[in-house]
Regions:
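Glycine-rich phosphate-binding loops of nucleotide-dependent enzymes
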Residues: 1-180
Length: 180
């Protein structure tokens, strides 16, 4: 599963319906059913399937700190909440690997700290996280292994402490040290 740098939600749907769309691929593959249901604003017509997906969606929303907002419109959420909703929807397909493309982009420090905790909890559930991110505090706090690219070329790889002190990484991202 993956999320995008620019948040992509179904604005006209509720918070829980957004997650249920993600769970749809795990329940049955009636693609037409998903689209026709959305058009009719009845996203999931089979009651037993809908209940199972709704229960799973609520569990994910609760896990991501959004359980109390399940019936609100996705467009009404704050920025950090919208990001967490997008991640909950990605988790609905029960991935073993989750690609997060700059999840902290545009977040304030409090939202980033909250995101950090949620990503760690996802990792603790056994989901491998591939993180593309420029917030180095977030990267260093979450990562077990880091690969650093400079203009598409790998310049370092290893645990955070090794990468953080690598002279090639420091030069690429901070510039050369000048001796006066």
């Amino acid at each position: 599963a993956r999320t995008f740098q620019n948040i992509r939600l179904f604005e006209h749907m509720t918070v829980i319906e957004n997650v249920m769309v993600g769970a749809h691929s795990r329940s049955y593959s009636a693609l037409w059913g998903a689209f026709s249901g959305a058009v009719l604003h009845r996203p999931f017509a089979q009651p037993a399937v809908e209940k199972t997906m709704r229960d799973r969606a609520f569990e994910l929303l609760d896990f991501m700190g959004l359980g109390k907002k399940m019936d609100e419109g996705a467009e009404d959420l704050a920025y950090g909440e919208r990001r967490r909703l997008e991640i909950a929807r990605a988790l609905a397909i029960e991935p073993r690997l989750l690609l997060l493309d700059e999840p902290a982009a545009g977040m304030n420090p409090n939202e980033t700290l909250e995101l950090d905790e949620h990503i760690k909890r996802i990792r603790d559930r056994g989901v491998t996280i591939v993180l593309v991110e420029h917030d180095m505090n977030l990267v260093m706090g979450i990562s077990d292994q880091i690969t650093v690219l400079n203009f598409g070329e790998k310049i370092a790889e290893g645990p955070p402490s090794t990468v953080q002190s690598d002279p090639v990484v420091i030069e690429a991202y901070l510039g050369e040290e000048e001796v006066l």
